[in-house]
């Protein structure tokens, strides 16, 4: 029996517009339920929708970034279904002619993931289930917050081309980064700004399997776990000769299982028909010009980071954090040594910012530039640079601090030379290492730290010691 994993994704992304899709209610404001609402987004009879121009511009920008065909004329439809979070009894979305078709996202692995369509639609209200688990099952009551009703969404639908849970998770992670680079969405999954549904099946000996849908996966981890569980469930069922029903599933993060929600619906169940209150969406040249203000590419950032750092995993981590990457890129263009930048921007500073509870855009970049200049000129040691980074994170001028504490002029020591001296002065320890006693490394490390008065980096020193001792043992 040969099994093949097959999956496609449907991703809903909240756009960073100031107002809702079809009314003037603000998308952001106090977290008081049902305060950012009006007759339009509450679905009152007789109200008429007015399309949000900025949402259209953002969709065009995404279409350009994902190499898609942008339809100059597209249409809105009504998607009919009954649910308490949908006050009109239908959702305004795009049906047979979406704003974007035939796009793709190139992953950092080089694989291009085809995207069938990208369309505009409105969000539903938020359901709050009053129970110990926060889920509908076992809830005493369900409350509705219509602040989310009418928030502009884009839905991104891929072809079923994912060959593993890891590949699907990678796509979502890099799409998330792309949206952030463009500036059209914060795409924070934990806040519901990016929500993922997956359609998954397992082919048996080349024969197409039953497709099931898993709804509302709200983290990269959940995508991996849900798809892995579902693949194993299908395989086990086929081995037992059982039939997989076509259904819609949830994902329980506590058990890592996928309990059924309902029988899966088809497009016929939703009775799509053209939205009579909105004319066809006709794109004009000025909309395309406006879309140019949203620019940025995760893949380009990743390739730059890989060139600077040289290690795929570290380059990817840097590129996924837009603000961190932009700081690194700014200093790299100014000619700072990339080894120095990698230590400061990807190792020291992230830990410090995490400790003080600040984001990358909250630290004075001129302070970081000053610290980099001092170390690149050899006027301070790495240890002093780290101390000054702490001060910069606390909004203290690092130059003034260094002058007041007489830290300038403390140059980095020649660590290789110190290690050579310690090894020459301790031949017995070297002989013990050659005979297999690796514990002497700690003793030798202590001798180096004593000679440098604690200014040497312990991790780097241990690594250099082990390299030298290994060579001496050959």
Curated annotation (Swiss-Prot):
It holds the Pfam family GatB_N. Allows the formation of correctly charged Asn-tRNA(Asn) or Gln-tRNA(Gln) through the transamidation of misacylated Asp-tRNA(Asn) or Glu-tRNA(Gln) in organisms which lack either or both of asparaginyl-tRNA or glutaminyl-tRNA synthetases. The reaction takes place in the presence of glutamine and ATP through an activated phospho-Asp-tRNA(Asn) or phospho-Glu-tRNA(Gln). This is Aspartyl/glutamyl-tRNA(Asn/Gln) amidotransferase subunit B. GO terms for molecular function: asparaginyl-tRNA synthase (glutamine-hydrolyzing) activity; ATP binding; glutaminyl-tRNA synthase (glutamine-hydrolyzing) activity. Its EC number is 6.3.5.-. SUPFAM superfamilies: GatB/YqeY motif, Glutamine synthetase/guanido kinase. The gene is gatB. GO terms for biological process: translation.
